[in-house]
């Protein structure tokens, strides 16, 4: 218990835990501990140091409470120590959707699509004042956090003329959409399975934005091998389209566009995390690049031509 914050919060708990187990945090800068009591357990989340960590914890608390009240399957929040940003939440076990064998995954995805559709309809009640960073996913967020980050974290040297050309492409193709509630990182490591039930975690970055973005995060997820089959991706995407009653042509256009935005984001994140001492993310870079190349070649020929001339992919 080297962290003084951990010692402090443990001293406030009644009853005291019988054992404290450190858990791996994957891509997060937070620290996670499983507290074992006589007949139960809970997860303690320590925020990253500084103002951002506390702000992130506050968003987690308010959005988590909102989702729970709205019937979304998320971990119950037992305690929130606002002065430190420490959270004590329900223990959902250790099995993420990522861990489920490929041959068993498909049945879960059908359930998850229904949960995603429920989340996205909570627009009018969503606690906007507790969003982290921005209230809305818009063009500027996509451009700075996903497209520019894609080049930055790969250390790709690109000219102003090149950036002007690709910005022109993204401006021209950025679609109009109805605002929905989006998770912003809706992928297999942020979905847990307990007793065959699905739970959504790591929702602190939720905000308003295009529903197709979260669907693309889910179905183009580089962690999941079954989505190397594009026909399966399209089949599940159309299942979502049917559930939310969208125009098929407009929906697919938006899905593919936000799919390439999301894959830019994923690739930049894998490079960034690898450079920050988490090398296990490197193995997902080729998968993400292959899927991005496929989408660009099939649906966005204008952009792939610019990329190929500049040896981007």
Question: What annotation goes with each model-predicted range?
Answer:
Residues 148-155, 211-246, 260-277, 288-296:
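Active-site activation/catalytic loop segments of kinase-like enzymes and analogous catalytic loops
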